[in-house]
């Protein structure tokens, strides 16, 4: 129950529904947003493996707590941000928080279940946790959308600041799960050696990157995309709720276990966004989130199942680092296409990236260890 409360609390962020407009209102252009995302990705890239190694040695709770504290500090900076350096500082703090949290909460849940010999229920429980977070973020979007009619955009950031402070306080009540240690904690070199000899990791990577290298840009720019499609900002809260509901529905569809099928739908939707009309584009975006809602718990479960017991957080961080590198590459492509063509055409480029990764996944999937 506490896991669900923490996930729900950290997801109740009304600021997200007006995030891009808040940045734009304070002078940030699309290129500035991408630069900030790249800074976030680099900080995550640099910090994830060290945090993972320390988490495997010192436990999960300190890093879950540190992660939420940094995210709270990020919003503290955003409340007073009026220049690119200030926004970059906020993103750097968010990156540190993300690096500290990376794999820690999933590992805490998995290890707690394993301690009670119930690890086979991880995917089910993680899907419930995900659905709780999605529904709460949908509620936050409704609140944020309604409030934008009568209050300044900064109100959303004040509410988010207090909610994150509450999340920090909730985290103090987590109990560290006992971990089975097979000798000493795995070093990074040991994990890298094991990583290189297991082809299943390549398949996992392809699936992780298929979504991870593209969904960030869908998240960051759907507001501007729909605005360019002449959809009024007042409807964005309801649109966001639709996306969250679709993602929650996807998270509940655990019986439909077809990674290739879901990925193909995802790619078709990305490509369709480059030519879609306003109403169709909302449907395509909703379907994207449906696919991602199914994929995220599935991939998380697979990673936890194959991760070494005494290096779980480090292994998860290693996967995440590779994902961040892919985001950097995709971000470069995104900026190029947006400047040369349009924001709408960037979705075709994202679809191409996902298609290449799906082909790699299909090839490696046929080669059994």
Can you describe what each PLM-predicted range is?
Residues 1-46, 199-241:
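Helix-loop boundary and gating motifs at the non-cytosolic
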Residues 69-83, 87, 172, 265-278:
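C-terminal ends and interior cores of transmembrane alpha-helices
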Residues 92-133:
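Cytoplasmic helix-loop-helix junction between adjacent transmembrane helices
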Residues 259-299:
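C-terminal transmembrane helical hairpin of 12-TM major facilitator-type secondary transporters
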């Amino acid at each position: 129950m506490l896991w669900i409360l923490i996930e729900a609390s950290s997801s109740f962020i009304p600021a997200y529904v007006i995030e891009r407009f808040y940045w734009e209102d304070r002078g940030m252009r699309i290129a500035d947003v991408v630069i900030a995302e790249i800074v976030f990705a680099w900080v995550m890239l640099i910090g994830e493996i060290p945090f993972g190694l320390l988490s495997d040695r010192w436990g999960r709770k300190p890093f879950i707590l540190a992660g939420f504290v940094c995210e709270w500090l990020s919003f503290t900076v955003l409340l007073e941000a009026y220049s690119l350096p200030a926004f970059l500082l906020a993103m750097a703090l968010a990156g540190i928080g993300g690096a500290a949290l990376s794999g820690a909460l999933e590992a805490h849940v998995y290890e707690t279940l394993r301690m009670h010999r119930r690890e086979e229920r991880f995917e089910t429980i993680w899907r419930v946790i995900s659905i709780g977070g999605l529904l709460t973020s949908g509620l936050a979007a409704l609140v944020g959308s309604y409030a934008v009619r009568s209050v300044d955009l900064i109100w959303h950031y004040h509410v988010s600041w207090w909610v994150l402070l509450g999340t920090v306080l909730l985290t103090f009540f987590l109990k560290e799960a006992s971990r089975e240690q097979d000798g000493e904690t795995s070093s990074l070199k040991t994990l890298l050696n094991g990583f290189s000899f297991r082809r299943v990791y390549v398949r996992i990577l392809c699936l992780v990157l298929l979504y991870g290298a593209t969904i960030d840009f869908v998240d960051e720019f759907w507001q501007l995309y729909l605005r360019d499609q002449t959809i009024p900002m007042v409807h964005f809260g309801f649109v966001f709720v639709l996306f969250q509901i679709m993602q929650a529905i996807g998270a509940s569809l655990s019986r439909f276990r077809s990674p290739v099928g879901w990925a193909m739908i995802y790619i078709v939707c990305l490509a369709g966004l480059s030519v879609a009309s306003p109403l169709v584009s909302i449907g395509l975006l909703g379907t994207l989130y449906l696919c991602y809602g199914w994929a995220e718990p599935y991939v998380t479960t697979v990673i936890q199942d194959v991760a070494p017991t005494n290096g779980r957080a480090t292994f998860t961080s290693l996967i995440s680092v590779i994902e961040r590198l892919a985001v950097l590459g995709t971000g470069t492509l995104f900026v190029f296409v947006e400047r040369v063509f349009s924001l709408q055409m960037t979705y075709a480029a994202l679809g191409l990236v996902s298609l290449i990764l799906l082909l790699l996944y299909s090839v490696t999937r046929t080669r059994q260890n």
